[in-house]
Amino acid sequence: MKAYNQTIEKKFYEQYSVTEYCSSTLAGDKKEVTVLGYEIEIPPERNPVRITYYESGWGKEYREKKSELQDKKEFYIENTRGRSSHQYHPFCIIECEDGVIMLLAIAWSGNWYLKITEDGRILTGQTKEMFARVLKAGEVFYSPSVIKAQTEDGNLDSLINHMHGFGRDIWLKHNSESRCLWTEWNHWWTFEDSQINEEVFLSNARAAAELGIELCTLDAGWFGNNRDITWSKLQGDWSHYNRERFHHGIRYLSDAVHKDGMKFGIWMEPEAMGALSELRKEHPEWEALRDGKSYENPYVCLGNKEAEEWLFQAMSSLAEETACDHMKLDFNLDPELGCNREDHGHQKNDGLQAHYEGYYRVLKRLSEKFPHLVIENCSSGGLRTDYGIMKRAHTAFISDVDVSSHSLNCFWHLSMFLPPENILHWAWSQTLEYEDGSHVFESFLIDDKTEESRIKYTIRAAMLHQLGMSRDLTKLSKSCKSLIKEELDFYKIHIRPLLGKGEFYHILRTDGIFAFLIKDREKGYLFLYNTSNIAHQPKLVLKGYNNGHKYRIENIDTGSVQELTGNQLMEQGFLADTIAGETAAIYIVHLVDAL
């Protein structure tokens, strides 16, 4: 037998036009073998001519880039921060000759590279610097998967809906509760950790109940024994509830929220190890080190089996003691190449691989123990969103920054790869004003002076996925509460039932204008957003309609009505009402009859 055998395995999901690829390396039966990285080749049906990919950073997710491939130069990008989406997102669109289009999604939360060679070969994996592992005789290593969706007719929207169907039916995680898409209030941007306490949380929870909000989430600031130490320094002390801020404990908050008919959510950063935490003092042997040195932001290496078991028990205890329905899991640091300690149980050059393998196991066990718990994936916003972690978490938080123009741009791109019901983001937040008068990002304050159209714009910008908000609900006037409740009710009654069931189309993105369509056979909702300061009157060409039917298009705000055939909607389109800056319009598209 050879020293080792390396093969590319693939599984074809014909109904969705999707193929899953992975690499397997089997050591021979005589001696051990060292795997120095791995590489998966994705064979294109035609020669690649263009790639669309996305740069990323905090508050700068989904910065679209395009590269022409006809000049026969090699294309190469890599992610080395240790989080799948920090430098680049692990998603891309590859256009080939003769109308062939591919969507690629890397199912891994750590480092990766993507290469398109001069002769058109598509290669992805990890370099030997990113990953190396010694296999014992007879041992096998399976690489993380890569997902490819492909169409040969050039119809990107059809391909996106196939990708959504594959994610929805085969790959992505869901349970009955995650499909409810609860509307959420989270205290973070308005109060952060410095201003949150028991009374602030409960008073806002009561206001949330009046608005019909269904989930109240307690973010950072609830753990550790000291009010004056920044939350990030105490992470890992998950069993120490901050009694200075929350006199009655966290279960008291949960019970109060449940009594008001809502769900309770709680935030944690499972992998983090606060620099001043009791965890770090008591278990220095679990800390990830690189070349014997601590990380600037320490973390627990889950390549250590004892640490992995501790984390599962800590998360289980938190879920049990707080009776939470939703757990927001964050990760705010870059492990880069990962831990290379040799006393953890993992090998010197596979620490990050072992860490994520351990984290995936923890999430799997947590869901098995708490099958109704909804798990939210967050990492400084959207810096670790990939098909690997989304096989183990129910929803992905788009970005820490939720200014509506940024949210819509991020959603435009992410919703090409993830179904809308697996995405969560907040309407533009009211951010905390710091002592120097600054804000983490521009705040959107709602009061009686705020234009009604701008309030609707910010809420509607969060309607095409799970909708949340972060603001002081107790300070809203009666008229503002009424408007917000009306918008939330519209979302819950009309839009949410289509998420996960309807077809989804990207209609228009130009000059600050975004338009999306979600529809079933009988009715569709067309969302038109103007994020600029200039009024526009765009022509909207729709998709997914029947040529032989007549449709009525009605603006829910102005009442304006047009009637057009399916052929007219998809060939000529219709002229929308003029839309002012920072405004959102919703059109209902009704089926009238067959011609």
Q: What is each of the regions a protein language model found here?
A:
Residues M1-G120, E129-A132, Y551-E563:
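Polysaccharide-binding surfaces and accessory modules of carbohydrate-active proteins
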Residues S84-H86, C92-I94, L508-N547, I588:
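Carbohydrate-binding surface patches
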Residues R133-E152, E582-H590:
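Short Pro-Gly-centered flexible turn/kink motifs
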Residues G138, V257, D330, I375, ...:
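Conserved, mostly hydrophobic/aromatic
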Residues S176, C180-S316, H326, E336:
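Aromatic-lined carbohydrate-binding/catalytic grooves of carbohydrate-active enzymes
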Residues G274-E309, Q313, Y356-T474:
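Glycan-recognition surfaces
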Residues I459-Y505:
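Catalytic cores of secreted or luminal carbohydrate-active enzymes
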Residues L564-L595:
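C-terminal beta-strand-rich structural cap/linker in extracellular carbohydrate-active enzymes
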